Amino acid sequence: MSRIPTRELGRYLLQGQICQRGCVASSVSKSRAKQLGRHPLLPHDRHQPTQARHAHTVTTTATPTQLAPSVPLRKKLKDEAKQLKKNAKKDNRKGSNQTVDGWELTVGIEIHAQLNTARKLFSPAATSFNDAPNSHVALFDLSMPGSQPLLQKETLIPALRAALALNCDIQPISRFDRKHYFWWDQPSGYQITQYYEPFARNGQITLFARDGIAPEDGESVTIGIQQVQMEQDTAKTLAQPGDTHWLDFNRVGVPLIEIITKPELHHPRTAAVFVRKMQTLLNAVDACVSGMETGGLRADVNVSVRRTSDASAPLGTRTEIKNLSTIKAVEDAIIAERDRQIQELEAGGTIAGETRGWTLGTKQTRRLRGKEGEVDYRYMPDPDLGPLIIADDLVDHIRKSVAYLPDHELSELADVYGLTAKDALSLLSLDNGGRIEYFYNVVESFGTRLQQGTEGGLDVRAYAPLAANWILHEFGRLVDDDSDNESTPFEVSPDGQCERVPVESLAELLFHLQQKKITGKVAKELLTALHQGNLADAENITAAIDAHDLWFHELSTEEYQELAALAVEGEDKVLREFRDKKVFPQGKLMYLVGKMLRLGATERIDPSNAEKFMRAKVEELL
């Protein structure tokens, strides 16, 4: 084989100057790669012109300009999952599948989360995920001969924040190991991890009923954390037409933490809640900034079952389901695997320890391979890395600087701001923490307007729920509209700012709505206009209301009374129900209120006042 010029190889691998999409093309199938005992990284004729190389490619006959657009494997799977979900039948028996009579489910979870760092774990290359493929790659990332790992000290800080948030004991001395396996996304043939001596052990996290755990778990359940370890991420694989995969090595060496729980989860819904709360917690302490939706957090679940009739029996043989990419997938995959194991055991079979896969939208798991063990991975201490020594003063400093934890914030949102647990959880989990900061900013601006001229102040519980409702539900409508909108996407920054709907603009809109100066319908129309860029600031909202005479000119008392009298005409049958029923028929009253709204000028009617006047009219006629 001809030697590739060193200069061209270096330019290709380290500066991202490659054809089209900038990824290393692999046209050898997985099975073929295993037969060869290696993974193909570079074609032997890499130094030839692009057209010459593709002229004799085995699996691809088109030139790069003729190839279909690159689709990341994760996006491809999600698109397929959406289609499967549309075709799947809905299970209306909510909560009925958390237990199976006569059987106990046991689940342990391994979470892999990308740390919020500027550098990779053992090289100075940047950890940017939005730049051109293979543009942030160091020599060590590709395992070039002679390259050595050098621990980037700053990567330890977010890892410590995560471990302390999980109530772990930080180990003063930890060490790095090599976990050997061969695949094309790991150039070195091994992953550097901390299998034997991790930097954190013996943590715990408590899940509460407000988090959404299974009713069978009661008011709360505490899950033990066995250990937290640092390790490297692998390359990103992009599937191409035919049996071809492209590799983006920007992700190789990105620092991860692996969080390993004890096998103390016994209900699928609680396991899913655990993953969701873990994602929220890691984001809250600024340890990780991307979640499952962007591939920044992945979950593996270990599932086993045993009969409840024998309390002394050991745990059953476990199987592992890899790379679950959504919270819902965690619950569904556990249910499917639990049911499969129970069916197998009840039929007289046995459970094999193996790794299984799961496809979103399906009802069953599938076998991938036999379960690897400690011997298979040939763990060994990494001879190129010394022990990691963590001083007590560093741990104390980080412990004091750890941010407000979600459980405390949830209590404050409920007790101080008057939000429901569901709304509080949603605000904390959306936009990687940006949505809750946006909420605080809007409430502050909203409250300032309301309290001007108010003696003694105004309880925040009087207006914060309105802000939360709009920030969650009306914003949800705007996000749905973005699916067909090619303009700037709807985004909220980590510090709670939104370019499409500025804080001051929403606060001004909500102020007019709360003061009943505009109707809810008008407020929604103004929000849509703001979202589409037709309104730029708070002054323009007020100006738009003035210009189009959108102010709420409510009916007078006499007009409400006349409208109520008109609405009850010809409704003798409905009115008789008010006389005959022992319980006040609220539904019939709202029917009459709806008739009022249809008969009158909707833009001048306050529904709550309409109900009040209609109730008075009905009582007058009884």
Curated annotation (Swiss-Prot):
GO biological process: glutaminyl-tRNAGln biosynthesis via transamidation; mitochondrial translation
GO function term, MF aspect, one: glutaminyl-tRNA synthase (glutamine-hydrolyzing) activity
Catalysed conversion reaction: L-glutamyl-tRNA(Gln) + L-glutamine + ATP + H2O = L-glutaminyl-tRNA(Gln) + L-glutamate + ADP + phosphate + H(+)
Keyword Ligase attributed: yes
Pfam families documented for this protein: GatB_N (PF02934), GatB_Yqey (PF02637)
Subcellular location: Mitochondrion
One Gene Ontology term, aspect cellular component: mitochondrion
InterPro entries: Asn/Gln-tRNA_amidoTrfase_suB/E (IPR017959), Asn/Gln-tRNA_Trfase_suB/E_cat (IPR006075), Asn/Gln_amidotransferase (IPR018027), Asn/Gln_tRNA_amidoTrase-B-like (IPR003789), GatB (IPR004413), Gln-tRNA_amidoTrfase_suB_CS (IPR017958), Gln_synth/guanido_kin_cat_dom (IPR014746)
Regions of compositional bias (Low complexity) in chain numbering: 57-67
Record EC number: 6.3.5.-
Transit peptide: 1-54
Residue ranges, annotated region (Disordered): 30-67
Domain of life: Eukaryota
Keywords, ordered alphabetically: ATP-binding, Ligase, Mitochondrion, Nucleotide-binding, Protein biosynthesis, Transit peptide
Family (UniProt): Belongs to the GatB/GatE family. GatB subfamily.
Cited function: Allows the formation of correctly charged Gln-tRNA(Gln) through the transamidation of misacylated Glu-tRNA(Gln) in the mitochondria. The reaction takes place in the presence of glutamine and ATP through an activated gamma-phospho-Glu-tRNA(Gln).
Subunit architecture: Subunit of the heterotrimeric GatCAB amidotransferase (AdT) complex, composed of A, B and C subunits.
Matches recorded under PANTHER family: GLUTAMYL-TRNA GLN AMIDOTRANSFERASE SUBUNIT B MITOCHONDRIAL AND PROKARYOTIC PET112-RELATED, GLUTAMYL-TRNA(GLN) AMIDOTRANSFERASE SUBUNIT B, MITOCHONDRIAL
Protein name: Glutamyl-tRNA(Gln) amidotransferase subunit B, mitochondrial
Organism of derivation: Verticillium alfalfae (strain VaMs.102 / ATCC MYA-4576 / FGSC 10136) (Verticillium wilt of alfalfa)
